[in-house]
Amino acid sequence: MGAGGKMTEQEREKQEQQLARGASTMQRSPVEKPPFTVGQIKKAIPPHCFQRSVLKSFSYVVRDLVIAAALLYFALAIIPALPSPLHYAAWPLYWIAQGCVCFAMWVIAHECGHHAFSDYQLLDDIVGLVLHSSLMVPYFSWKYSHRRHHSNTGSLERDEVFVPKTKGALAWYAPYVYNNPVGRLVHIVVQLTLGWPLYLATNVSGRPYPRFACHYDPYGPIYNDRERAQIFVSDAGVMAVSFGLYKLAATLGFWWVVRVYAVPLLIVNVWLVLVTYLHHTHPALPHYDSREWDWLRGALSTVDRDYGVFNRFFHNITDTHVVHHLFSTLPHFHATEATKAIKPILGEYYQFDPTPIAKATWREARECIFVEPEEGRGVFWYNKF
């Protein structure tokens, strides 16, 4: 270790290489109060990284829309003209490609929700509402709950999503699911495919509320009185898109809508759950109760991952999540530079895992079942049966 117990850059690179070669663990994140402040972290980032640009942000929207339009043309004009064997093989390629592109658009809408798209809040909200509604996401509803996630990351009592349970809070059948490879696989598939719509509709994996919580309910416990009117706007956006899909189904057929829109949307949901799950679930990440939690340590209890070529395609939401939690209004096109700038300041407090994503998903589903406290402290770590 370096001076003061800090991991040197060479030691960190060695650890990352070992992880990439198959090592199963990485060093736990420190849980002591950091020897640096948010202000010191911010000073390490070049000032231009915080500058938002309407033109640059819209260039990424145009990029994604052009690719999505080209793929739609491929689905509607080229696939039907292909001979049967190629015809059936081409549809899965379209679904996966279009799902990836639409997830990239989802990320742009997420930027809008953080006011990282432009200097104009109204413009951000209009762009975010249009993009998220087109993907069946209630924009303002999720914007507000997601803002609370950023305000309470790592808190067992107040975080909004992927809140781990203690061992005693799990259902009696949990050991039979997680200790069984088949059960574990089923759990992963269900979580990836149904997790997002269930979270929006019933708050699955979210923090407990005193009554039923739903992102579509303007009067639900997630929102305060100032936010309720915009929840109606979010619902109207989703309903408008739903009505448009209904009219398309009535004109072109139900299965046309499924092939062209619904299956790519399912891929979007899979990416969304996978990326967010892996950002906040790792054996090296702590959680805190009210005795220990503070905002900075909570914001640092996340991990950057390597998705290969998808990092840039997904606007680097995958490999710059730590800096995003520290400065959520920083635009994505500066996040890589900002991450490089803060790593020397964060030292051991910065977590990056290059483990291949499929392997990491299986490992986290096996190792991160519940959390247990350190003796005499309000610090909790993942454990398994």
UniProtKB/Swiss-Prot annotation:
Keywords from the named record: Fatty acid biosynthesis, Fatty acid metabolism, Lipid biosynthesis, Lipid metabolism, Membrane, Oxidoreductase, Transmembrane, Transmembrane helix
Sequence motif Histidine box-2, location on chain: 146-150
TM spans (from-to): 65-85, 89-109, 122-142, 185-205, 231-251, 254-274
Induction of its expression: Up-regulated upon auxin treatment. Up-regulated by jasmonate and methyl jasmonate.
CDD domains linked: Delta12-FADS-like (cd03507)
Pathway(s) it belongs to: Lipid metabolism; polyunsaturated fatty acid biosynthesis
EC number: 1.14.19.-
An MF annotation (GO) of this entry: oxidoreductase activity
Annotated region (Disordered), positions in chain: 1-33
InterPro entries: FA_desaturase_dom (IPR005804), FAS_N (IPR021863), Fatty_acid_desaturase (IPR012171)
Principal subcellular localisation of the protein: membrane
GO cellular component: membrane
Class in the EC hierarchy, top level: oxidoreductase
Tissue: Highly expressed in root hair cells. Barely detected in panicle, shoot apex, stems and leaves.
Short sequence motif Histidine box-3: positions: 321-325
Placement of sequence motif Histidine box-1: 110-114
Domain notes: The histidine box domains may contain the active site and/or be involved in metal ion binding.
Role description: Delta(12) fatty acid desaturase converting palmitoleic acid (16:1(9)) to hexadecadienoic acid (16:2(9,12)). No detectable Delta(12)linoleate desaturase activity. Involved in the biosynthesis of the aliphatic side chain of sorgoleone, a phytotoxic secondary metabolite playing a direct role in allelopathic interactions.
Recorded family membership: Belongs to the fatty acid desaturase type 1 family.
Identification of the protein by name: Fatty acid desaturase DES2
Natural source organism: Sorghum bicolor (Sorghum)
GN (gene name): DES2
